[in-house]
């Protein structure tokens, strides 16, 4: 007989948003994680953000060089400062790691592998680095990771540069690394579409995490 727990681990809810501001989504992630219990179905949120710099818990103000007209938001994820903006694939991973039988390091490795495999599908040879989380093409960073684990559940996630204005990265030391060069899929695949990359990554993730079914829902949790 199938139990509630086994049903939850087999199903993933996916929510897709348009271009949205950062703080309402961040607060919704916090609320979802605080309220979830052992029977809460895992979720993945796919979206783009209006321009914003986010400063992680380990963030040092000296890495924010000249933000100009782009707001800087102090947040509760790991890592240093990064930039989010239109044309970047944001993925928020709201997962019960205990149910998935994963530790934080396992999750990071899985995310990096799904990104490398997604990029390979576009003919881009990418790799992870042991000394600096994220995914790189040569010495240029194409995807960033920043997670928080609370009561065995993850939130925040990853940012993959697809087709965006990279100039704002020059206003910071990305992820705390002075002079770190950023790149994006468009530099290798000029006609790339954000939606196709989102679908390609999602397929890799569903397979890697072992979900058996995907349910698409609209709006933030509680808005249905």
Swiss-Prot record:
It is an enzyme of class 2 (transferase). Residues 38-213 form the BPL/LPL catalytic domain. Keywords: Acyltransferase, Cytoplasm, Transferase. It catalyses: octanoyl-[ACP] + L-lysyl-[protein] = N(6)-octanoyl-L-lysyl-[protein] + holo-[ACP] + H(+). The active site is at 175 (acyl-thioester intermediate). InterPro entries: aa-tRNA-synth_II/BPL/LPL, BPL_LPL_catalytic, Octanoyltransferase, Octanoyltransferase_CS. This is Octanoyltransferase. It comes from Hahella chejuensis (strain KCTC 2396). The gene is lipB.
């Amino acid at each position: 007989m199938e139990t509630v727990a086994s049903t939850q681990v087999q199903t993933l809810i996916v929510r897709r948003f348009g271009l949205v501001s950062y703080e309402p989504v961040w607060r919704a992630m916090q609320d979802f994680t605080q309220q979830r219990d052992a029977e809460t179905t895992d979720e993945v949120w796919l979206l783009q953000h209006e321009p914003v710099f986010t400063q992680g818990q380990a963030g040092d103000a000296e890495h924010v060089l000249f933000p100009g007209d782009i707001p800087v938001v102090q947040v509760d994820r790991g890592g240093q400062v990064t930039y989010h903006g239109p044309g970047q694939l944001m993925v928020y991973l709201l997962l019960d790691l205990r149910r998935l039988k994963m530790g934080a390091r396992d999750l990071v490795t899985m995310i990096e592998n799904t990104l490398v495999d997604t990029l390979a599908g576009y003919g881009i040879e990418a790799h992870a680095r042991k000394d600096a989380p994220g995914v790189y093409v040569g010495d240029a960073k194409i995807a960033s990771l920043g997670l928080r684990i609370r009561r065995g559940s993850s939130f925040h996630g990853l940012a993959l540069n697809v087709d965006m204005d990279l100039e704002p990265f020059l206003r910071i030391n990305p992820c705390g690394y002075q002079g770190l060069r950023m790149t994006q899929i468009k530099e290798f695949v000029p006609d790339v579409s954000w939606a196709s990359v989102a679908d390609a990554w999602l397929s890799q993730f569903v397979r890697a995490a072992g979900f058996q079914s995907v349910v698409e829902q609209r709006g933030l949790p509680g808005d249905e």
